[in-house]
Amino acid sequence: MSGNGHLRGLAAFVAGWRSVLTGLGITGRIALQKPVTVRYPAEKVVLSPRWRGALRLRGMLGRDEIPLVTSDPPSYNGVIDGLHRTERLAPCVGNCPANVDARGQNYLVAEGKLVEAYELVRERNILPGVLGRICHHPCESACRRNYYDEPVAVRPLHRLVAEEYAKTERDVRPLPKTRGKTVAVIGSGPSGLAAALDLMRLGYTVEMFEKEDKPGGALYSGVPSYRLPRDVLHSEIDGLVKLGLDLRCGVEIGKDVTMAKVIEDHDAVLLCVGLQVSRLLPIPGNDAEGVMGALEFLRAANWKGDAGVQGKRVFVIGGGNVAVDVARCAVRVGASEVKLGCLEAPNEMPCHPWEIEEALDEGVVAMCSQAPDSVLEEDGKVVGMRLRDCLSVFDEAGRFAPQYGEGTTDVPCDVVVFAIGQASKLDTIIEGTGLQLNERGILIVDGSTAATTAPGVFASGEVVTGPGSAIASIATGHEAAHSIHRYLQGEDLAERRIPRPVPVYPKRQPALLEGVETYRLRKQMPMARPEDRVTDFRPVELGLTHQEGLAEAARCLRCQSEVCVGCTFCARTCPDYAIAVERVDEPGVRCLTRYDLDVSKCCFCGLCAEQCPTNALTHTGQYELSFYHRPLLTFDKGEMLRDGGGTRATGRDGIDSPSCPTRREGTRL
């Protein structure tokens, strides 16, 4: 062999061993790493495959009840915290600011128990019929059906159960007043109503003061009746009055009676007056005739049905939900043209996407990426709006830092409505009370206890949090009621107090719906036609029928209930086809006829348990099955439902002939 041949052979030998050593190094590094399983749909504790024992089912629909989330007001946070810590908190419940038991509602509706569903919902959402029309439904954004098709229509189901409850004739009696103490609630918005009901349940006498002639706060004065019919609002508030709420409308604190007098006459006071004044931009022309604030415009449109814009061109400044409400109301009260201008690009607008879509359908013109520069006027009257190009709204860190271009656009108009935010008006209320405002004019309040700087005076709602949602205001009312109860019982406001847990759920894109069976898709809310709804303030959303509601509720996966609902996701996920699931193939049936696990095929990867939306599928302590030789071995339904001790059951645990109590005509998962 020549010298060159020897060199080539040596080079190949060295290269081969280098490859082997490199591979061993990679293998060693991987071996030292922690094994990782798929984090979908929720992160779980990561276990090595050899420490996963045989699978079992904790429960099964038709044999086991779905647990309901219920408790007395002071203990509710503790219940939610316990469920969260033990991974038994349904995402829809955890993502709701008030922790309304949407899962329990869906279960009861699917069972045909709509009145019971209403009573369950009202424990935390004191106005189910109202929120069933206007809530921004964060529960639906956390719904696990987003992974597979579309979320369950929780908000429309709130409305349905409220409508069914209203049809019943029930003997409502006042709640007993057992405490001998009186609490004053100033303001009849959602926060005040929630606190009032909690305090009445605890045995206190509650007196509520409202400066307007009708109760409801911003729900009455600010939400258009095409979204929230006034009879629905007043009917639900009347229900609270029947429970013993002493409601006094037409009484303005600071004018008709002083705040100091209210504090003197009551054992505790809750201030929840909301935000009563619109903010205006400090730009030239903002004092011209024809310039209005959003709240003033909405009050005129809602109360009088005439905001003085008949036949006029209206320009709305703002991109939030209030701005969209103003624009849609302007169309309904006879404006000849309605335009909406905002800083944000179309995909950045802070309003809910469905709100602006409905506004565009009704003829509103959106001018995005435009900043208000000045109001054009002649002889003191509005003749137009000058806009400047807005290049960006937020900086790289996500902070509000708009950048403007040089280009401007003049838009002819007769009326300009500022819908850029609201502020509180507390000057006359706090005089001589010990209540203090900070340098920005905002009431000083302890964020964890709702206590103000005046002893025995608490605050909640938007006067504390700023502009927000109705359900968020309701949540602050619950917390304030808890603090008032502690105060009146002589307890420390913060000691051993459990704050409401705020789980973080991953944001995700909607599932691809191509090929999804139509019976699995969400029941869409029937809507009035755009050409019909712009002529008056009749409701835009028409509501689900009773049958549609039952079918929609049956789509709920009963997440974290530890009860198998027959969704078959485990069988579809299993890479080794070790799971076989069969159920009765009839409309309305949610009972399994077969659940088999072929242990000889199972690779103990854990994907099925991680995929299970209800947390019903879990690993037992039968670790030996995961790494010793496994003969042909199949667990049937009865064995899958055995107890958690690891001992195989010999029978079928009394479920040979499932009664299928969840049959409903025309419903299907």
Model-derived segments and spans:
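A conserved FAD-binding loop/helix module that cradles the flavin
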Residues: 326, 460-488
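Flanking helices and flexible, charged tails adjoining ferredoxin-like Fe-S electron-transfer domains
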Residues: 1-15, 65-85, 152-182, 201, ...
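FAD-site-proximal beta/loop scaffold in flavoenzymes
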Residues: 287-312, 395-467
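Glycine-rich dinucleotide-binding loop and its adjacent helix/turn
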Residues: 161-177, 235-255, 278-333, 437-448, ...
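Cysteine-centered iron-sulfur cluster-binding motifs in ferredoxin-type domains/subunits
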Residues: 55-111, 125-154, 192-194, 462, ...
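Rossmann-like dinucleotide-binding cores of NAD(P)H-dependent redox enzymes
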Residues: 205-208, 212-243, 247, 301, ...
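Feature captures the FAD/FMN-dependent oxidoreductase FAD-binding
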Residues: 116, 177, 182-186, 234-283, ...
